[in-house]
UniProtKB/Swiss-Prot annotation:
GO terms for biological process: nucleotide-excision repair; SOS response. Residues 612-634 are annotated as: Disordered. It is found in: Cytoplasm. Forms a heterotetramer with UvrA during the search for lesions. Interacts with UvrC in an incision complex. PANTHER family: UVRABC SYSTEM PROTEIN B. It comes from Renibacterium salmoninarum (strain ATCC 33209 / DSM 20767 / JCM 11484 / NBRC 15589 / NCIMB 2235). ATP binds at residues 48-55. One of its GO terms (molecular function) is ATP binding. Residues 648-683 form the UVR domain. Belongs to the UvrB family. Residues 35-188 form the Helicase ATP-binding domain. This is UvrABC system protein B. Keywords: ATP-binding, Cytoplasm, DNA damage, DNA excision, DNA repair, Excision nuclease, Helicase, Hydrolase, Nucleotide-binding, SOS response. The beta-hairpin motif is involved in DNA binding.
Length: 693
């Protein structure tokens, strides 16, 4: 039976809901892309200048072709940014976020020179883990799905067939033995916990079973009448408030690496066979220490798998569990998509090389582990896809970039251009200046911009030069900050926000001022040592850096150089080509460039507003009670039954959790907690107005 036959998929249309309509080059680009995809072209390039709305064009393309879509992005930060944009544009469709769930990850490794074995060590971000499970759940239960993912999506994941085989189907009126259902939940790696009810656990209260699936924020309640499922409800796991009644629900396994008893028994037999062969090899090479090490580690893992159906590092045995041949490709997120899915690769000039590099980096570490008896050779088949395996799995692909690479340009049959911005803004003018006296000239240009309440980006070649320049500018009264690789992600977001707000006027950086930096207030980008050929001054890097000034009406780029290199010439020629097209369009259509008004806001803003409101409400509720007792507000008749005193305690606790989540960059979780606090405060206000508080 196919996956589609086992699951009744939700089929809903992709629908963009926005106050804006396609403008500038967008209508033509959307029409051209749609025609090419519908005509079966396998590779399509969208050459979109910075600020032309490539993300919105992608959303409208998805609406036109009506296909599940995987959007691959170069890093987690841009993935989160893009996922939020798609959620705003397609609010009624499933927009999922799939990135590595490790906040910290140290893979197991062995250093032969010092005889040092490094154990695997990691810290998992639970909210990101939930979003990963949510992505696979959506892909298996509906078609209107967009998954925004980093290249981690090509790493091994359990097979969709086995994942669906472990699925438990719940339907009103079905006859099911309650104890048998509990055994099924345990079999797919859910844990019974009647005290601490959270994701991946279930609890039992008489004829009522409640479970929180790994991919859900809400819990499920199954009410039995004898051996019959009488009612199924979705409820709030914290308050017990019933959200809606369900007719049929699916509960997928609590791990992507789940295997039924029969498959696990076969896997154990295969592992034992491989172990016997490998031990013979090692002993034949007189590697007795390695043989003993491998015997102990593998035997322990086998005992855990026989007793528990699981072991730490079970992914290293995924080849045997999946029943794959040696050297064959693992399953990954792409295998969860239907055959007709669309692949979109954002900033393809950066993302594509990452895909190709993943396999070799992983393989060099694992070879050492296998050679020294820490892992069986089959562990090397728990890996990311090779480049050719990746190409075999993807169908039609759209490459998005302001500077497409040679690979995608060679693959595509023509290029779709998106040069005209909806705002009418044109690419910045590029001015070449001599390096002699460049710092004094830069200082004068900065002062001119500061008088106009505009911002400046300066990019240097070395860390030393960036530090010296920052110190020099500070000494001359310029409000300047230095953005470097040691600045953590949260502080980087704050720095960029402070630049836009005018807390300081100049930001100095090295290679941090390229893709994904959206700063409409910046009117000048100064590139020092522009004529020094290399990675940081390649044509691609220069075009991307020039694009940072493309969101301001009076944007300019100053290149300090004593000669014009080939890279400079290519970047300037491409910029001038785009400017000519943009100016001609504006003249023909009577368009006046309008400044881009982009809201300066983020999760920290909403948390600050929430804090002020919470403080006011709690003061009015007579806050000042003793601390130390945690409320247990799980009620079956909704929030109305929760005492006001407990509600106040709960609001305080969730507010603290909200700030903790934001501090750890768990913005999705922080936003969800903010919404929960809002609901609880609404209930408390109703109590106050009714005279109960």
């Amino acid at each position: 039976m196919s996956l589609a036959q086992q699951i009744n998929r939700v089929v809903a249309p992709f629908e963009v809901i926005s106050e804006y309509q396609p403008a500038g080059d967008q209508p033509a680009a959307i029409a051209d892309l749609t025609e090419r995809i519908n005509n079966g072209e396998k590779d399509v390039v969208l050459l979109g200048a910075t600020g032309t709305g490539k993300s919105a064009t992608t959303a409208w393309l998805i609406e036109q072709v009506q296909r599940p879509t995987l959007v691959m992005v170069q890093n987690k930060t841009l993935a989160a940014q893009l996922a939020n944009e798609f959620r705003e544009l397609l609010p009624n469709n499933a927009v999922e976020y799939f990135v590595s769930y490790y906040d910290y990850y140290q893979p197991e490794a062995y250093v032969p020179q010092t005889d040092t074995f490094i154990e695997k060590d990691s810290s998992v971000n639970e909210e990101v883990e939930r979003l990963r499970y949510s992505a696979t759940n959506s892909l298996l239960t509906r078609r209107d799905v967009i998954v925004v993912a980093t290249v981690s999506c090509i790493y091994g994941l359990g097979t969709p067939e086995e994942y669906v085989a472990g699925m438990v189907t719940l339907k009103q009126g079905d006859r099911v033995d309650r104890d048998q259902l509990l055994r099924q939940f345990v079999g797919i790696q859910y844990t019974r916990n009647d005290i601490d009810f959270h994701r991946g656990t279930f609890r039992v209260r008489g004829d009522t079973v409640e479970i929180t699936p790994m991919y859900e924020e809400q819990a499920l309640r199954i009410e039995f009448f004898g051996d019959e499922i009488e009612k199924i409800f979705t409820l709030h796991p914290l308050t017990g408030e019933i959200i809606r009644e369900e007719n049929e629900m699916y509960v997928f396994p609590a791990s992507h690496y789940v295997a039924g008893p029969e498959r696990m028994a076969k896997a154990i037999t295969r592992i034992e066979d491989e172990l016997a062969v490998r031990l013979k090899e090692l002993e034949g090479q007189n590697k007795l220490l390695e043989a003993q090490r491998l015997r102990m580690r593998t035997t322990y893992d086998l005992e855990m798998m026989q007793q528990m159906g699981f072991c730490n590092g079970i992914e290293n045995y995924s080849r045997h569990i999946d029943g794959r041949d040696s050297g064959s490709a693992p399953s990954c997120l792409i295998d969860y998509f239907p055959d007709d899915f669309l692949l979109v690769i954002d900033e393809s000039h950066v993302t594509l090389p990452q895909i190709g590099a993943m396999y070799e980096g992983d393989m060099s570490r694992k070879r050492t582990l296998v050679d020294h008896g820490f892992r069986l050779p089959s562990a090397m088949d728990n890996r990311p896809l090779k480049w050719d395996e990746f190409l075999e799995r993807v169908g039609q692909t759209v490459y998005l970039s302001a500077t497409p690479g040679k690979y995608e340009m060679a693959k595509a049959d023509g290029v779709v251009q998106q040069i005209i911005r909806p705002t009418g803004l044109i690419d910045p003018e590029v001015i070449i200046k001599p390096t002699k006296g460049q710092i004094d000239d830069l200082l004068g240009e900065i002062r001119t911009r500061v008088e106009r309440d505009e911002r400046v980006l300066v990019t240097t070649l070395t860390k030393r030069m960036a530090e010296d320049l920052t110190e020099y500018l500070l000494g001359h009264g310029v409000k300047v900050q230095y953005l470097h690789s040691d600045v953590d992600t949260l502080r980087r977001v704050e720095l960029l926000r402070e630049l836009r707000l005018g807390v300081f006027d100049v930001l100095v950086g090295i290679n941090l001022l390229r893709e994904g930096l959206d700063l409409p207030e910046v009117s000048l980008v100064s590139i020092l040592d522009a004529d020094k050929e290399g990675f940081l001054r390649s044509a691609t890097s220069l075009i991307q850096t020039i694009g940072r000034a493309a969101r301001n009406v009076s944007g300019e780029v100053h290149m300090y150089a004593d000669k014009i290199t080939d890279s400079m010439a290519k970047a300037i020629d491409e910029t001038n080509r785009r400017r000519a097209i943009q100016v001609a369009y504006n003249t023909e259509h009577g368009v006046d460039p309008t400044p881009l008004r982009k809201r300066i806001a983020d999760i920290t803003d909403s948390l600050a507003r929430e804090d002020a409101d919470t403080k006011s409400l709690l003061e009015s509720a007579g806050k000042g009670r003793s601390r130390g007792k945690a409320p247990v507000p799980v009620r079956h008749d909704g929030l109305a039954a929760v005492p006001a005193e407990d509600l106040v305690d709960l609001i305080e606790q969730l507010t603290a959790q909200m700030h903790s989540a934001a501090g750890e960059l768990q913005f999705e979780l922080a936003a969800r907690l903010r919404d929960e606090v809002g609901d609880l405060k609404k209930e408390l206000r109703q109590m106050q107005s009714a005279g109960h508080a």
